[in-house]
Amino acid sequence: MEGNSGFRKELVSRLLHLHFRDCKTKVSGDALQLMAEFLRIFVLEAAVRGVWQAQAEDLDVVEVDQLEKVLPQLLLDF
């Protein structure tokens, strides 16, 4: 991540290109910046919801189980 600003554009580009059917598909700099911001917000929201779920279960540590419980609703919200 670039400081606190989000994911590196190179990483976002690589993630996107892994799922493109045509290897010649290009992504503009603005689109990469937008996707990086989207991913930053998504990960932050997942972390916050994981904390809320852990607190609801009276746990001090967020584990994979809490993230798995909040993921379906998180995906629907995004």
From Swiss-Prot:
Keywords carried by this UniProt record: Acetylation, Cell cycle, Cell division, Centromere, Chromosome, DNA damage, DNA repair, DNA-binding, Kinetochore, Mitosis, Nucleus
Gene Ontology MF terms: DNA binding
Subcellular location: Nucleus; Chromosome, Centromere; Chromosome, Centromere, Kinetochore
Induction info: By retinoic acid.
A biological process from GO: resolution of meiotic recombination intermediates
N-acetylmethionine: residues carrying this PTM: M1
Top-level taxon of origin: Eukaryota
GO CC, alphabetical: FANCM-MHF complex; Fanconi anaemia nuclear complex; inner kinetochore; nucleus
Keyword DNA-binding: yes
Matching Pfam families: CENP-X
Keyword Cell cycle found: yes
Chief localization: nucleus
Subunit description: Heterodimer with CENPX, sometimes called MHF; this interaction stabilizes both partners. MHF heterodimers can assemble to form tetrameric structures. MHF also coassemble with CENPT-CENPW heterodimers at centromeres to form the tetrameric CENP-T-W-S-X complex. Forms a discrete complex with FANCM and CENPX, called FANCM-MHF; this interaction, probably mediated by direct binding between CENPS and FANCM, leads to synergistic activation of double-stranded DNA binding and strongly stimulates FANCM-mediated DNA remodeling.
UniProt function note: DNA-binding component of the Fanconi anemia (FA) core complex. Required for the normal activation of the FA pathway, leading to monoubiquitination of the FANCI-FANCD2 complex in response to DNA damage, cellular resistance to DNA cross-linking drugs, and prevention of chromosomal breakage. In complex with CENPS (MHF heterodimer), crucial cofactor for FANCM in both binding and ATP-dependent remodeling of DNA. Stabilizes FANCM. In complex with CENPS and FANCM (but not other FANC proteins), rapidly recruited to blocked forks and promotes gene conversion at blocked replication forks.
Family under the similarity heading: Belongs to the CENP-X/MHF2 family.
Protein name: Centromere protein X
Source species of the chain: Mus musculus (Mouse)
Gene responsible for this protein: Cenpx
